[in-house]
Amino acid sequence: MCDEDVAALVVDNGSGMCKAGFAGDDAPRAVFPSIVGRPRHQGVMVGMGQKDSYVGDEAQSKRGILTLKYPIEHGIVTNWDDMEKIWHHTFYNELRVAPEEHPVLLTEAPLNPKANREKMTQIMFETFNTPAMYVAIQAVLSLYASGRTTGIVLDSGDGVTHTVPIYEGYALPHAIMRLDLAGRDLTDYLMKILTERGYSFTTTAEREIVRDIKEKLCYVALDFEQEMQTASTSSSLEKSYELPDGQVITIGNERFRCPEAMFQPSFLGMEAAGIHETTYNSIMKCDVDIRKDLYANTVLSGGSTMFPGIADRMQKEITALAPPTMKIKIIAPPERKYSVWIGGSILASLSTFQQMWISKQEYDESGPSIVHRKCF
């Protein structure tokens, strides 16, 4: 990589977490919650020099006095003022760089509305004065990070899950499937089933505790019915968890009932197909000649694919759906929580990519619609 001072910035804006850093690095420098918090009551903290908004970890730690909002819902930006605050925080507080000195690579959800990519482009050039920028599709970056250009990516984060078939580096839009079931829904579901056990979690602060329980103790069962059987007859699957106040709670079949909702959305009262069936449906929407390449290169990406056991279960479920002789391979890279960011870091540091950037000059000549001609 050339000198740090001209390194491109890579910013992956997820519904739950924002990942940011420098192209050429192997991991993001900054990872913080995609939250903007505003004081619930004006002037509670007298003389504290109260700010009118807080971003990320600071918003998280002051959540008791704030109203927290997520500007990215289901992977798509819905509140641009708050989004701008997150980007500002990313550049100036987290990375401590001047955005007008660095090209910026942003990521977007598959099937992101055209107006949204234009708005991102406009904010980068007009608010932050970046010299150059690019918008890449998250799933495509994850595939690059796994060293492939053809495959199907199951990307599941905090706010949305997508299955994205990619051929020779291009996403196939007609076959992309979206499932509005992801980490946040699983956390909510775990809150609900723990309440049935007699533990009460209701506030946004308590939701964070439940998210931690989910991340530390949940796993995907290979055979759900059999696992339920085991859980009801022995205590071998029980684990204990200490709450911040010192109380210890025990969690049993909830450990695998929670992520099971990804395979059986009916648990959440949803009509949708599970992630295995959605992946299969995506593959079946593709040309018959490329299907075997997709089955053999099914890549998991995003934080909600981090549950132990998920790859084996996917293998089993897809095998049951696919033609009998088909070779099926589920790739679950250990760094998949950050593979979108890593793919962006790889892409932005390639010498061949340098002519792909949208420059400030091109933007000034063509306006925001330039993004559709240069980023696809």
From Swiss-Prot:
Q: What Pfam families would the database entry show?
A: Actin (PF00022)
Q: What is its EC number?
A: 3.6.4.-
PTM Tele-methylhistidine: list the residues.
H74
**GO CC terms of this entry:** cytoplasm; cytoskeleton
| Sequence positions bearing N6-methyllysine | K85
Where is the PTM N-acetylcysteine found along the chain? C2
List the subcellular locations. Cytoplasm, Cytoskeleton
GO terms for MF: ATP binding; hydrolase activity
Q: Which residues carry this modification: N-acetylaspartate?
A: D3
Q: Does the keyword Coiled coil apply?
A: no
Chain positions found as Methionine (R)-sulfoxide: M45, M48
Q: Post-translation: what modifications?
A: Oxidation of Met-45 and Met-48 by MICALs (MICAL1, MICAL2 or MICAL3) to form methionine sulfoxide promotes actin filament depolymerization. MICAL1 and MICAL2 produce the (R)-S-oxide form. The (R)-S-oxide form is reverted by MSRB1 and MSRB2, which promotes actin repolymerization. Monomethylation at Lys-85 (K85me1) regulates actin-myosin interaction and actomyosin-dependent processes. Demethylation by ALKBH4 is required for maintaining actomyosin dynamics supporting normal cleavage furrow ingression during cytokinesis and cell migration.
Question: Keywords for this entry?
Answer: Acetylation, ATP-binding, Cytoplasm, Cytoskeleton, Hydrolase, Methylation, Nucleotide-binding, Oxidation
The answer to whether the entry has keyword Ion transport is no
Catalyzed chemical reaction(s): ATP + H2O = ADP + phosphate + H(+)
Coarse class of the protein's main subcellular location? cytoplasm
Family the entry assigns: Belongs to the actin family.
Q: Function, please?
A: Actins are highly conserved proteins that are involved in various types of cell motility and are ubiquitously expressed in all eukaryotic cells.
Q: What is this protein called?
A: Actin, cytoplasmic
